[in-house]
């Protein structure tokens, strides 16, 4: 319907009128025939009649169109207010009429008092409600009902409390009924929602069960493989493998190669006693080569003779030389073992056993073993477990590493699932609410991962982003480096962010096992706890007996207790000499000598404490833990004066007595109860006493640490500066020859072949021999974090012990245990030994290993644990934190020897050619040199040559690495130009006949001298030699037999 004509100011154009309502057009619509009508008039007409109102043609509503120019003209007309009849004299444009009507003072409004039905102007509403309305509240009834009285009731005095209460009750009941209906609606809606969620939960549960069954099947398969591997790798008598026979093969070189690789050999030429079991074995045979034929060689054959020359006790180099010098036809005599019969009985649980402990083989050990070179002793042939019974192998022998490598690839293969997440921000400055982690150096690029999620953020409310997810794309752009990721995440161009995330497909937590298995594990845990309790009681009895024996006059020989070091294996030493050829360098022999004498009591104390939480009874308690604290030597005390040590010991004893006085009467009674007449105390009393002592000593150790820290703080500040300078001066050593660089190596370090510029190979393709395999470090996820926790426990060691604490040392926390004098030196390990035996304290097996390592995966989600690269980033942070915590106390404990521990190292994340990531150690020296270069460059950036000439301190110009490279290139070009000019001059002299024999002799001598000097320089310098080391050690050769010419002169200004 249109607008009334009398509302407009002045006359209205007839073209603005509607032919149906004869009013001014409101939202005009035009028909295909050209007629214009109001929208409210023409739409009902066309719907009913399906034709134009003028009856000219048939039309439909879809053919009607808006006339915007006509509408704009009408909106500019002046019109009176809608409330003109109520007194409003305002005249506005039609387009502003709606805005005026909202705030017009003459708009009709109903009184808000209950019962009043008057309609007033908006401006008169407040005055009416306060003053003139008969239904306004004026007070409370004083007759007893307590309801509000209106002005009308007070004026007429006709208020009835009973009727008012009934009316009020009815209103409340009506409200209750309304709320009840709403409650039923909400309950029905909630029931439907609950059913839907239960259905989804059931589907997820079924999927979880299917996944758990699939995982169990894989676990069973891997367990079978592990059992067979354990059985194959365990030492067995030679008679089980079958009889050996001597075979002679005749070989001819094809294209200069014999077509096979060898490993092994006696470790040293001087070792001619014949006791070593080393020999030369065939490790690989090239397909269609000279050795790959009927009557040729086979893998694992032991080479005895080559053309009559005995190689049974030869070294690896002697065997290579013998094959090189052999003339065709080459007669090779080998020892070959007959194939083993396949076991028919049931296979037991495969375990690796050393002298003192029994440890389960895990996947980390298998991966480490697969990367070791082939053993030099005849390895038992692996059985092919997954083949059908009727299928026989093509050869009698095969390489175990082939199976291990395939298994490693299958384990390392990760099936990823991708998810696209859209995050919507209401404001462009809102934070997404998650933190990313990535590499901080510039050597290699790596992925971007989600490390933390804010609980109340946009990402947390979305719920699809998880910790450990890798970000592949942001807003459709693939991420190449961290700069791009930061730029896209912080960009303010787009309020919405679209992320493409990748995570491992298997995302099961540890709760996938069924209830029966959990019950079984709980029972097993209780059994182990009972076993631990029983051992603790025996331990306490032996302690009481020992104390009584000491009081009766008997003495305990400390040397007897210490003699057990060489009788028990520490769990990390080598079991045979099969890996001796991994790196044939002189430092290995030194490491062997040191390793045999470095099995300390500290490792056993750490093991005893780590078993305390779990209750495992793998290792019995030993009397080694009861060595008196008085046995501490000068090396453990460091530079503490004797009077200070004695005063600290008295203070500690006083602390023990004061702490124990509150709980058990007298100090002597609570701390020294083994020496009294309480030998017959019951088990419950002993347990309570032990618990009280443990709690007291834990609080004492914290106070002791604070006392030591306050006592040493002033000295530490001065020593830190000296130690840092000493470390920088003497810490740069050759990593190829230094034994100190391996001082802190751990048992989960494995060897991986990488590309090297200095690989050595024999003439007949011995490239796979152990000597040409450089070493690199790879950390397993299980051991790295646990090792960091042990480092933190060792770092908190106190520097002194007390009398009462040495009596109960095995039952204390790691801080007291670390106070033993035998913890002063870390154990030296050989890199070639690592991985041959698992560490006892690292491997518990099964789910019971989790309680003893609370920091292992504390804040890492389950699905992120399957992401190898993300886990290694987290491990890097954990290891760096543990090392930083350990550095302070280690310098306090042994400040003299801290500078001799070798070059400082840091953990770096590296990327292999196949894309996998690993963590390795790199010297901090590179980083320090880079920082030093930047600092010097900043200091000398604003200095000119004239300024340097005027100043007293001659700084000199600093040349960057790129500039030094350019200098080297220019120097090379100048040298080549000089040689060219010299050669041209010599040619010219030859043509003129001026050259003489004397000059030729001089040139030959000079060239020979230069060549000899180059060789000497190579012997003096290496890749890691610095000018400071050259000046410190002089210009002597490494063996100290020669003195070379000075190659360098340094003038200090």
UniProtKB/Swiss-Prot annotation:
Name the Enzyme Commission number(s) assigned to this protein. 2.3.2.27
What segment(s) does the record annotate as region Disordered? 563-604, 747-855
Catalytic activity entry: S-ubiquitinyl-[E2 ubiquitin-conjugating enzyme]-L-cysteine + [acceptor protein]-L-lysine = [E2 ubiquitin-conjugating enzyme]-L-cysteine + N(6)-ubiquitinyl-[acceptor protein]-L-lysine
Cellular localisation? Synapse; Cytoplasm
What GO molecular function annotation could you give as one example from this UniProt entry?
A: ubiquitin protein ligase activity
Name residues in a coiled coil: 683-709
GO CC annotation? cytoplasm; synapse
Main localization is other
Hey, which pathway is this one from? Protein modification; protein ubiquitination
| Biological process (GO), any one | neuromuscular junction development
The record places its RING-type zinc fingers at 18-56
Question: Residue ranges under compositional bias (Basic residues)?
Answer: 844-855
Q: Which SUPFAM superfamilies match?
A: PDZ domain-like, RING/U-box, TRAF domain-like
| Quaternary state and interactors | Interacts (via PDZ domain 1) with kidins220b (via PDZ-binding motif).
Under PANTHER family, the record lists:
E3 UBIQUITIN-PROTEIN LIGASE PDZRN3, PDZ DOMAIN CONTAINING RING FINGER PROTEIN 3, 4
Q: What is this protein called?
A: E3 ubiquitin-protein ligase PDZRN3-B
Q: State the species of origin.
A: Danio rerio (Zebrafish)
The root-end lineage is: Eukaryota, Metazoa, Chordata, Craniata, Vertebrata
